[in-house]
Amino acid sequence: MVLVRHGETEWSRTGRHTGLTDIPLTENGRHQARMAGVVLGDREFGAVLTSPLSRARETAALAGHPEAVPDPDLVEWDYGGYEGLTTPGIIEALGHPWSVWTDGVIHGENTPGETVDAVRRRAAAVIGRVAPVLDRGEDVLIFAHAHYLRIFASVWLALPVAAERLYLGTGAVSALGHEHGTPVVVEWNVVAPR
């Protein structure tokens, strides 16, 4: 299972929580997407899926996979009232330490937000749907988002959400697999040399 985080956006560059807001790639993000295609090479996949958000779809296309099928379960974590804010800004407003991983999000004006468990359930649903492809010995390629893919990896590994410890840069390629029947991380946060 190969995972690609979308290329840089203005909000990812400035550390803003970018959940369901549809932010386009920057020029650097487009370059990162093309470089992800270099890392992927000419490898063949039994299924190619993407978040329906434009930053992931454009990354898929620029990485050489315009055929990627949008899957709504691949959207980023819904940050609710914290959408568009930075972690330092949230901490300053709250007046105490805060982590999206342990403290969660608040209801927003236009969206209720989402718990980490809700994101885990979405990730588990995707893993369940692609299992038949993997069982046939074919690879699956997924284009999505940083927090989502970190949670996805923790679900794959059957670990509690320790995803905050798995840094994932923009345009990075990662791979999950099995060793002796045990789910493992094969590669993490791989980018093409500049």
Residue ranges and their predicted role:
Residues 96-118:
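Short glycine/proline- and acidic residue-enriched helix-loop micro-motifs
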